[in-house]
Amino acid sequence: MRSFARISVLGLSLALAQPLLAQTQSVKIIGLVELSGTGATSGTNFNDGAKLAVKEINAAGGILGHKVEYTASDTQSQPQVAKALAVRAIDDGAYVVMGPVFSGSIMVSMVETRRAEIPNFTGGEAAAITQQGNPYIFRTSLTQSTAMPKVARYLDNLKAKTVAIIYTNNDFGKGGRDIFMKALEPHGIKVLADISTDPGQVDFSGAVLKAKQANADALFVYTNEEEAARTLRELRKQGYDKPIVGETVLTSQKVIELAGDAANGAVAHVGLTADAPDPGIRAFASKFEKEYNYKPDHNGLKGYTGMYIVKAVTERVGKFDPKAFADAMHGVRLSAKEYPGILMDVTFDKNGDLDRESFMTKVVNGKQAVIATLPSLSAGK
């Protein structure tokens, strides 16, 4: 009888504990981000955006009543370190992995998350990322294949017949350069100088001199942030006076800070910008700056919206099932009206590429200004 009583009391105690247990359960989302090395600017922005989203999500009750437990590991901007950290994230029971941002790193690390069937969001823009048949990889930004035709169209509108190219010789730079050159073909724009530079390169005098000597109608610059700023400073130093056009990085906040007045006049297509004429994005930028004491760039938006996409799709699925989540991501359409945290309406295709509005921007008086809002490719379909 006493045993029965003890069992009954134990059973009642466990039953009463269930609501508390449910409240304290958490779901692990692990970031693999560039917090040091050449990608520190990108990775820190991405990570801070993700952390801000997690703070808000948890304050609002979490995801399906579960608190988000987000931790980030530093890839040191090294692909092999990223790969090792991906294995650790799998061992630690990650539901979703966020990052890396650099294309070269995600190309290596996503092999591990794919093998473990864990959804993986990346800030990388190289087209090759989503061309590997990986059903668990998803972007937080437009692919180069979507962005470069918009840059080529802008050059065509400038009546440019020739162009010089300065690009970084890494997965990001080479991939973008290749797609950009293809995007020029329908417009009949010829490449007069194809100039490769190294990641982390400091001296751009030779590259800029080659671009000047080519005497093309415009210059396309496609490098990472620090290199872009150095290129702009050298261009102004050598008196370059033709249009300077880029994609995403060239007019980013970090480049403007590093290049100073040399950034003025630069034009770039961007998939995301804190300066977009959108109340939701402006509110995000204000919250981010208040939280971290610096202005976010496109990578901050990637981390923030990526985390909210995880929340939205998980809640549609109704459970924490990585495979079901990945299946639901393919072909999903999410509206900012229904899910404000995603900031902009977005769709994902079968490859994990996303589509949404984007922007043409220009640096004016040391600030990025939006000069045009471009529709998503799926608009009107």
Language model regions located:
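Extracytosolic ligand-binding ectodomains
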Residues: 2-7, 11, 22-381
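Sec/Tat signal peptide C-region and signal peptidase I cleavage site
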Residues: 16-22
